[in-house]
């Protein structure tokens, strides 16, 4: 008999429902965009109408398990694509944990953003899903520093400087305007704003990061308080980032309080005065969703520090990495071969094995760590959401995977990776991880084709 979690888990059922619904949407979209001339419409009128009936479809208890031989045969052609470069991978039956295929799956490779699956998994194991980060404004010593208030960073990187009613990039973001309103209501006459950036320790830029990525919009220095994750254009995904995000947050508060932003500076020590204002971030589960769907590097680094704090480690790059890998390892997830310097996967010094990644996804799909199960729902949907919204939409195997495959992507120069879950043609749920280093110019298409085979293949023999 199957474990009860497999048949009745709310998260698994919801995930399957979403996958089926997206598959229907993709199919309908394909029909609607296949041609709009009159002759096509007239021809279609004579054909039987297709029925689109999305529904919650439970995973079959009796679906056949793919064989290793069948899997190897099905993957032979896509694995041979030279654009995959140096490829490692692993495929596992989600229900039993049986390894079905592997290629050098214990070889450490540069994982890129699939590293975020570890950060998300450890966060789900460690933190409350409703956990929020609090940013405060505290009065400095009014005897020695009259009129000075201190913006105290609580680790939230996505405070919004947008005025009330204006959309922000991050759903549910706390607002500088709310802090300013509360400070005004306190009755203090503000003359200057300082910033307490002391929550995080160590460097704010990880080894193996390229400073050019600040201007390319991929990252900013990781500081204890930030506005819009350091974006200089708050509602643009690829906006260049700031090199001084904490001071920018202080300047935004100063401007909202009609104080000269040019006078903003760092506080010399944490303030001990009266708290004047506070705001809270979105809940952890929403922040994880944003991190995974958009592959948000800044969000990943700050969530890693939350895990570090909860496990008694320094809120630094090293502390976060130790906390994330340590929590997973102590929970039974194999971290052998993992060597990381950040929580986002942006560093070229990061190394993970395909087995590490597949074990994380497998733990989310398996019976032993139910706290990790929401990870499946956080993964982008092929052809439907996040970083997979424009992938798996061309080519036979890739198109058939749209709506059925969910995976975290990874992409750096000549690096492509995928780690996720898919239901095969026989109704069997498989987990997988592929890492391609030294990839060719069509490496991303090649790794998508490889993953796409898992959907079309029953692989029973």
Predicted stretch roles:
Residues 126-140, 261-267, 371-376:
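Short, well-structured active-site flanking segments
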Residues 97, 111-129, 225, 252-253, ...:
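Active-site SXXK
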Residues 43-108, 178-187:
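Beta-lactamase-like hydrolase cores
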Residues 86, 145-223, 230, 261-264, ...:
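Mid-domain, small-residue-enriched loop/turn segments at the edges of structured enzyme/sensor domains
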Residues 24-60, 132:
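C-terminal region of N-terminal signal peptides and the immediate post-cleavage residues
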Residues 221, 227-374:
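A small/polar active-site loop signature that marks catalytic segments
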Residues 100-102, 308-461:
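Small-residue-rich helix-loop
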Residues 1-22:
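N-terminal export and membrane-targeting signals
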């Amino acid at each position: 008999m199957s474990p009860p979690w497999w048949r009745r888990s709310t998260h698994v059922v919801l995930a399957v429902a979403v996958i089926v619904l997206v598959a229907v949407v993709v199919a309908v979209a394909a029909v609607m965009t296949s041609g709009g001339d009159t002759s096509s419409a007239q021809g279609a009128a004579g054909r039987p109408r297709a029925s689109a009936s999305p529904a919650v479809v439970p995973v079959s208890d009796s679906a056949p398990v793919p064989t290793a031989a069948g899997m190897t045969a099905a993957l032979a052609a896509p694995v041979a694509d030279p654009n995959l470069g140096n490829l490692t991978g692993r495929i596992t039956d989600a229900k039993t944990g049986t390894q079905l295929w592997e290629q050098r799956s214990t070889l450490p490779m540069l994982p890129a953003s699939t590293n975020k699956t570890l950060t998300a998994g450890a966060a789900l194991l460690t933190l409350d899903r409703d956990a929020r980060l609090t940013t405060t404004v505290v009065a400095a010593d009014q005897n020695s520093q009259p009129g000075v208030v201190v913006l105290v960073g609580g680790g939230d990187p996505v405070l919004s400087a947008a005025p009330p009613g204006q959309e922000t990039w991050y759903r549910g973001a706390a607002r500088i305007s709310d802090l300013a309103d509360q400070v005004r209501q306190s009755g203090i006459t503000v003359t200057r704003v300082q910033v307490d950036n002391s929550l995080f320790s160590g460097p704010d830029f990880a080894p193996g990061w390229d400073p050019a990525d600040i201007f390319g919009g991929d990252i900013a220095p990781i500081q204890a308080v930030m506005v819009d994750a350091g974006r200089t254009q708050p509602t643009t995904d690829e906006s260049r980032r700031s090199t001084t995000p904490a001071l920018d947050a202080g300047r935004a508060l100063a401007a909202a309080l009609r104080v000269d932003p040019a006078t903003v500076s760092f506080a010399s020590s944490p303030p001990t005065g009266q708290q004047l204002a506070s705001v809270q971030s979105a809940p952890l589960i929403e922040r994880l969703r944003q991190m995974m769907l958009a592959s948000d590097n800044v969000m990943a680094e700050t969530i890693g520090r939350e895990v570090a704090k909860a496990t008694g480690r320094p809120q630094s790059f090293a502390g976060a990495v130790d906390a994330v890998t340590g929590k997973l390892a102590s929970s039974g997830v194999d971290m052998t071969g993992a060597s990381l310097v950040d929580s986002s996967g942006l560093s070229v010094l990061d190394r993970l094995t395909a087995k590490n990644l597949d074990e994380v996804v497998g733990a989310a799909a398996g019976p032993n760590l139910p706290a990790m199960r929401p990870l499946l729902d956080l993964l982008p949907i092929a052809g439907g959401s996040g970083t997979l919204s424009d992938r798996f939409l061309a080519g036979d195997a890739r198109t058939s995977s749209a709506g059925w495959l969910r995976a975290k992507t990874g992409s750096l120069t000549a690096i492509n990776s995928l780690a996720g879950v898919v239901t095969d043609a026989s109704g069997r749920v498989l987990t997988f991880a592929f890492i391609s280093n030294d990839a060719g110019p069509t490496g991303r298409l090649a790794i998508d084709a490889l993953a796409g085979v898992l959907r079309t293949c029953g692989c029973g023999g």
